[in-house]
């Protein structure tokens, strides 16, 4: 570790670090919600933080290449000519990297006509002569030549500081200055330093050790004599200049105070939440300052009865912008919560759970700042209170008192509600999302009964099957190995068993499910491996975790439903994630069998049939599509008859499946390549099928084009009911980002409207079931399905009520069809739905 007391200078080779940072994520680039590649900036900042922590320097600079030709290009035309062009995604990040460095208070340097290495070396040598320790951060070999008693190279990725001794260990040269000779002889492919033909690193080292100087080697070595001119040019190219004219000294390199507001703005734009959290340590402990609330009337928005609130530790903290109150009397808390006062809170569903423990309930009207922020931009990754304060006010609260949070909720309301009104989101907010909060809270409280015995039996069965599969796999492989290790599995399949190799990854040949599925037909061992993976995932993802989630007192799982978890408006769930339970197949069915009703109740499954295709028919106003649904036709069969030009009775099952894939695929932006891959046909055949489809349902094709144009015009998409989703990627130059955005933009009005419809149905069903005094109610919402637990003696009444509400004509003349089934467990209820 570097001594904190030591006066030291850190000089960073900016381009070198930016390149390494960018390519560290090349297989899985980091992007923010706008589709912007942020890999280089993230990696650079991460390294910068590590460097600052390790060296605690008082003096520092980051030096960049100017991007212009240098004296080396004039000397040797081919210099760096073979280096691939800098990727556009990296070039676009360099200005932001420089901005971040400056915001950290660190000097940014570049000089036209010289490379960063030359400027860096000049400054380093000048300071080292005065006894200052200089640490150079780079991955370039050429800078090793200036290492001396006071100059060191630091590899930030390997966390190694190179001095003379370590340089000798790494490169085999007795003195770091010999690095230029090594590069001159062996060449450097990265910088296109030619070197001497036929001489590699080993031979170059041999020459360096044999002769006392480079000049002697040129005179005596036969190969060098033959290529003397090339060797001399290579040595000039490899020699770092240490005499660049610059007035930069220690004073200019002093680190200034970092600009937290600038860093917050940049990190917020890039969505670097981990870095933002770290910045909070530099912020004051509290964020509330009286001046924020000087204009009392403005805070109250000229409306009476608007209160920010926070419930904590059996105390209700409220604020109306003028008065702060701390209510501890339970009756008064109840009175306030049930009043007609407009209550503004954050994550109100969580507040409801806390209030229930205290014996209180919260009644409408209320405004949830978290949900409002999500509605305005559902593409952000996080909606924690600190994120909202940062995003809206550039404030980074480290610690907020309960009183302050009540006040800050009012600030957020003041900022968010006008935006909600501007984007026409008030109906979505007040008529759908706010009433839904209490329904989800009650679903979480209600939970769902679990057949623990069945889950235990299933776990035992899986363990037995895993043992059998392992034995079979080892016998077929002829060796025991770790089946869960992709590297070991690849070695067995592709090296030992000589199975056909497919796509290659960084660590070897791929063994992902798509690859194994291709091999399964010809290799029984692969079928066993796929089955082993399938049941292992079932065990580790569902059976084992679920048993740990069962509440001992109730024998029920109390899943968490997340209102702000998706960009489409759909609900998500966690603890457990019900969305990921397999819909089809034996395993999905077995898990659903474990979700049961109490002895006196039954479960009702209500599932929308083809809701997304029906929405597509409605919003595209395609006559053929609408007609099929109005006449209750088999839409996939109808599509198949038209695409393949056959009468209905001549259409094969395979052709109907292709039509189904195209029908649904077009909602999700299925490409000809995607269809070709799924069906095992050529891209041209797939293109013809899609063109045929769009020719038949031409109004769908027109609607798709209209949606793309509207999204380009506004930058966001809308559902039937007005839910919005920003699509900044629609303006992207990167083709991959643009095409991905187009697919999402086409899908949003369909999937988002489906989310709105099921939420509207949930609200109305909940109200009706309460009006009619049902004991049970909704327990699960997943995909397009609702699951209810209802008393047996009222099951028919509940079925009729649910079906009637869910089938309402939200889509005018396009009917919504709901399949309803009942059973003692979820699997039976789902399977009997019709």
What is the meaning of each model-derived region?
Residues 11-16, 136-139, 143-144, 153-169, ...:
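Conserved beta-strand -> loop -> alpha-helix junction used to position metal-binding or nucleic-acid-contacting
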Residues 467, 471, 475-527, 695-743, ...:
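C-terminal polymerase-core module
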